Amino acid sequence: MIYKAGSYEVIVIGAGHAGCEAALASARMGCQTLLVTMSIDHIALMPCNPSIGGPAKAQVVREIDALGGEMALNIDKANVQIRTINTGKGPAVQALRAQADKRQYHLEMLKTLFNQKKLDILMAEVEDIELSAGRVKAIVTRTGARFECQALVLTTGTYLKGRIIVGDISFDGGPGNQFPAARLSESLKRMGLRLGRFKTGTPPRIDSKSVDFSKMIEQPGDKRPLRFSFISPLINRPQLPCWLTHSNKKTHQIVMNNLDRAPMYTGIIKGIGTRYCPSFEDKVVRFSHKDSHQLFIEPEGRDTDEMYVQGLNTSLPEDVQIEVLKSIPGLENVRIMRTGYAIEYDIIYPSQLKLSLECKTVEGLFTAGQINGTSGYEEAAAQGLIAGINAALQVKEKEPFILKRSEAYIAVMIDDLINKEIVEPYRLLTSRAEYRLLLRQDNADLRLTEKGRQIGLVDDNRWMAYQQKEEILEVESNELKFSSFTPADEEMADFLSGKNTAAIRDRVSLWELLRRPELSIYDYVEKGWLRDNDPDILEQLEIQAKYEGYIEKQKEQVKRFEKLENKMIPPDINYDEVYGLSQEAVQKLKIILPASVGQASRIAGVNPADINVLLIFLEKKRRK
């Protein structure tokens, strides 16, 4: 029997990384919010890799932080190792990566949720969504509780009709053998939403007591304290190492001998997997010319013996998994604690969404995370934040919050999801961002904190820290620009000679000199030419000076890009009346309904000739 259980302004279904950000954003913006989860014990679960960050992902975590989200703060409290990767490359692709204590990550997020005003948590399975006149009206749980809402955010992860597969064994289930959301997919289909089926997988977890680390290469964290959040304290806590080993010819032969039992190759798995995180058996087959693959043995926390075998994502039968593991150096006597598996799940094709992450055909329904066809905790959290913000803004009858591709990796991802044809799990990569030199992890606060303040997510403490940083950067950069030396200056001549770099021929500022690869901002601090500021400020000054020319070029590119972005397309346009558009372009434009010519230009199937036709049509219409 269905009964009236209550009413909320915003309801969020699912409490993974997307759901937590959505619920916190909505509540912090003043909306009475309900977060519904199938298990309070699995809130902010890390069912796959125990890490946050990496290329493109670290930039996203920093963007979430700058806007007032939680992921960065949470991983700073719960990491067991943190380091910067890609240090040999430019700042556009350098990235933080932290190993998480999975249990502590869950507990820290749970604490934050419990302490958040205007946020309630309910453990239940939602099986139906009620609509009224094409708008979300209420949700109904399996036990009959009916909650009304003004906006609904779906962040169901891989639970929608989840199916676990190990060898020839399969059963209904969510990540880590939890219950799946069995009925909600049917409710979405009744709304007319188009669903697909994707697949992901996870490696086995092994007992650290059975590992011979002497046969592996230690991978320590950075010695200097690091942080994801711009406002976290810098703490130099004890770190746990990761370990590097490799598969070998024997390992690969075991896989090849058992392909007839691999569900990836027997047809048991129907869902489409991610290209950038293939199963181990897929790697062995696709890269048969390689004799070995890297495998990282990673701790899952400080108070557990479980370790994660990064790079060995598999759905091979359990006995084959054991044989594979025991062929790897250091794992000859290994014990499995949890078997690796594949999971299939339902997704909503994201072309059915607006840039606000609201469904085009169902008013008040927002979706975020793996339900939108993405992979990764960071991608999910970012979408959850945006969906939560826009759900709250809609309740307040305000305009949606939409970032541009030139402003954030978050925008690159959302824009890609809606405009590209997503046929496999989407992973954010630095190569997807046209303006990645502008979208660095170090300047996310400078790009986005003001926007977070405007929508009500950046509190006074964060705002004051941001303003102080801006002020220091301006003062110090001006000092470097106006402090100059001539060739006659002996102190400068000795300094440059000691750094094995050419002497100056004309008057040069410290700012200009810093462009030389031989010189570091810390050299200036050592000489007393610059104050010993916070490391974030010193890093920012150095990047701005060294890459000033390249940064200015990208800013010019952005100006050209924004000309098309600012050419808006009327929402009532009839593409059948736009003479000269290709048939495919008409079809795709009708589905996506782009808001601007810039967005239209990025739709798969819309070519430059179609854009020219569209521009001419809009100009003629404007002149009438």
Swiss-Prot record:
Protein name, entry field: tRNA uridine 5-carboxymethylaminomethyl modification enzyme MnmG
Function according to Swiss-Prot or TrEMBL: NAD-binding protein involved in the addition of a carboxymethylaminomethyl (cmnm) group at the wobble position (U34) of certain tRNAs, forming tRNA-cmnm(5)s(2)U34.
Family: Belongs to the MnmG family.
Binding site for NAD(+): 273-287
One Gene Ontology cellular component: cytosol
Keywords: Cytoplasm, FAD, Flavoprotein, NAD, tRNA processing
Cofactor: FAD
Localization annotation: Cytoplasm
Pfam families with a match to the protein in the record: GIDA, GIDA_C_1st, SAM_GIDA_C
Subunit structure: Homodimer. Heterotetramer of two MnmE and two MnmG subunits.
Record organism: Syntrophomonas wolfei subsp. wolfei (strain DSM 2245B / Goettingen)
Lineage: Bacteria, Bacillati, Bacillota, Clostridia, Eubacteriales
Protein residues bound to FAD: G14, A15, G16, H17, A18, G19
A molecular function (GO) term: flavin adenine dinucleotide binding
Swiss-Prot/TrEMBL GO biological process terms: tRNA methylation; tRNA wobble uridine modification
Keyword Oxidoreductase in record: no
Keyword Membrane among record annotations: no
Signal sequence range: none
Domain of life: Bacteria
